[in-house]
Amino acid sequence: VHLLAHELVSRLTNGEQTVIICGNNKKRAHSLRLQFHKNSNVHVVGFTRHVAEYMAAADVLFTKPGGLSSTEAIARRVPLVHTDPIPGCETKNRAFFVSRGMSVTGAHQKELAENGIALAHDDARQIAMRDAQRENSHPQAGTAITHLLEKLVSE
């Protein structure tokens, strides 16, 4: 996280900001605050109940390819950069999203930062990614499954 944050912050231009949400990891939040205390364009946030608002305000979201964050990002149509996965399901999630144009990734932290900054500055790529997210998501799937189950049970 520290290296990726450094790579991103070193590429910020005037007016651009980075928000780093650390959740319950107080040690990481503290060390990031120390690392970036002189940079007014970097905001380190610990646990917050306002992740949805931060996500809605984001031009690009960097996140590991877990199911919840990734699904929320595509539901909100947020351009997405998937960072290093935890081996297993997250590796498959990242491959699924990238192969369908719903996210980008990189082989190392510098490439992740470069790809995310390029995405933030490329309106056409953002539109294409949002279109891919819309085409590959099914926000009403839960409701459809519920109706199908109700129909099957009533027969």
Question: Language-model features: where?
Answer:
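Donor-nucleotide binding loops and adjacent catalytic segments primarily
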Residues: V1-A57
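Short, glycine/polar-rich helix-capping loops at beta-to-alpha or helix-loop-helix junctions
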Residues: R28-L32, S69, G88-R94
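Short alpha-helical segment that forms part of, or immediately flanks, the ligand-binding pocket
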Residues: A52, S70-R76, A95
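Acidic donor-binding loop of glycosyltransferase active sites
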Residues: A56-P65
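Structural loop-to-beta junction motif characteristic of Rossmann-like glycosyltransferase folds
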Residues: D59-V60, R76-P85, G101-M102
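Conserved donor-nucleotide binding/catalytic region of nucleotide-linked donor-dependent transferases
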Residues: V104, Q109-K110, I117-R134, K151, ...
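C-terminal alpha-helical cap of glycosyltransferases
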Residues: H138-E155
